[in-house]
C-alpha cells in the first residue's frame, strides 16, 4: 500500500471551495470513502448561457496517493452528475447545441471536435442513436458520443455515468 501524501488544511479548504451550495461531500461510488467535490478553473470552459446551471467537477479522495477520483459535469437544475473520461479533463468546453433544442455539447478546446451531446427528452421521445443515462425530473437524460471519439479508457461506460445527487 502506498501512503497518501499529506495535504495542508489550507490547501484542502481552498481546493474544496465551490459555488454550488447543494454540492456536498459524499461517497460517490459506494466504496466507503467520502469524496470531496471541487470546481477547479482548469477543468474546462463554460459557455455563458450554460454556466448558471452546469459546471465541471472533480471529485477528490485525499486519503489516496492519487486523489483525483472522478471528473465530470454537474447539472445544477436536475442535481445530477455525469462522469466523463478523465482523459477529457482540461480540454473541454461546454456550449449550447445548434442541432438539438435545449441540448448541450462538450467540444474539445484545441480543435473544437464534438465529443458528447447531452439532452433532457420526454420519456416518449425517439432515442435512436442516444444512450439513456436515466430518468431525471420525469424526463430521460440522454447522451451520445461524437462521431470521431476514441477513448483510451477501456473501462469507461457512458451508460453507467449518471449519478443522482439528491
What are these model-predicted stretches?
Residues 3-12, 68-73:
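Beta-propeller fold detector
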Residues 143-166:
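Surface-exposed amphipathic alpha-helical segments
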Residues 11-24:
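Repeat-based blade/solenoid architectures
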Residues 28-40:
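Acidic/hydrophobic-patterned starts of short beta strands in beta-sheet-rich repeat architectures
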Residues 1-2, 51-64:
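Beta-propeller blade signature
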Residues 70-92:
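N-terminal "mature-domain start" segment
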Residues 41-47:
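Short glycine/acidic-enriched loop and turn motifs that connect beta-strands
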Residues 85-130:
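Secretory pathway targeting signatures of secreted, lumenal, and periplasmic proteins
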Amino acid at each position: 500500500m502506498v501512503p497518501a501524501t499529506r495535504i495542508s488544511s489550507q490547501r484542502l479548504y481552498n481546493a474544496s471551495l465551490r459555488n454550488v451550495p447543494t454540492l456536498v461531500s459524499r461517497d460517490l461510488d459506494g466504496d466507503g470513502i467520502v469524496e470531496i467535490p471541487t470546481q477547479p478553473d482548469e477543468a474546462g470552459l463554460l459557455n455563458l448561457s450554460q454556466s448558471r446551471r452546469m459546471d465541471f467537477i472533480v471529485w477528490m479522495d485525499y486519503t489516496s496517493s492519487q486523489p483525483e477520483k472522478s471528473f465530470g459535469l454537474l447539472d445544477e437544475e436536475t442535481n445530477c452528475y455525469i462522469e466523463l473520461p478523465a482523459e477529457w479533463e482540461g480540454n473541454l468546453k461546454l456550449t449550447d447545441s445548434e442541432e438539438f433544442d435545449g441540448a448541450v455539447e462538450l467540444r474539445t478546446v484545441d480543435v473544437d471536435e464534438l465529443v458528447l451531446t447531452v439532452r433532457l427528452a420526454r420519456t416518449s421521445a425517439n432515442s435512436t442513436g442516444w444512450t439513456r443515462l436515466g430518468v431525471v425530473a420525469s424526463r430521460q437524460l440522454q447522451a451520445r458520443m461524437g462521431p470521431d471519439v476514441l477513448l483510451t479508457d477501456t473501462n469507461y461506460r457512458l451508460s453507467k455515468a449518471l449519478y443522482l445527487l439528491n
